[in-house]
């Protein structure tokens, strides 16, 4: 979605995740690099609205919300790889997202400096 949608950025993955929520599908594009199995039922369709939508493929921490759904993209525990450098992706290693499940309030915890990130 990021590579094929104008205005999307690898540094703001939550924006792409919100597009997936709007489309109600985890793989809304056909063809390209994402293989889609020819099954009788499309298992990538979001039939129910999730409370939390979590991903983390590109190693950049990002938090947002969309129509009551908490959107969380996890970072990583490693620094920038050569591939990420060629793609212009700057990961955010060592930052974990913790969610209070009673309130759905997210918090970032920076393990690089052992402090909470605003």
Feature locations, PLM:
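Extended recognition/assembly regions associated with phosphoester-bond processing machinery
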Residues: 1-118
């Amino acid at each position: 979605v990021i590579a094929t949608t104008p205005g999307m950025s690898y540094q703001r993955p939550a924006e792409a995740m919100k597009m997936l929520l709007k489309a109600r599908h985890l793989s809304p594009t056909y063809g390209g690099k994402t293989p889609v199995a020819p099954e009788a039922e499309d298992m990538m369709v979001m039939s129910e609205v999730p409370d939390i939508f979590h991903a983390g493929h590109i190693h950049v921490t990002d938090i947002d919300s969309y129509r009551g759904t908490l959107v969380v993209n996890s970072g990583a525990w490693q620094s920038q790889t050569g591939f990420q450098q060629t793609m212009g992706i700057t990961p955010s290693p060592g930052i974990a997202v913790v969610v209070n499940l009673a309130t759905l309030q997210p918090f970032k915890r920076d393990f690089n400096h052992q402090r909470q990130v605003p």
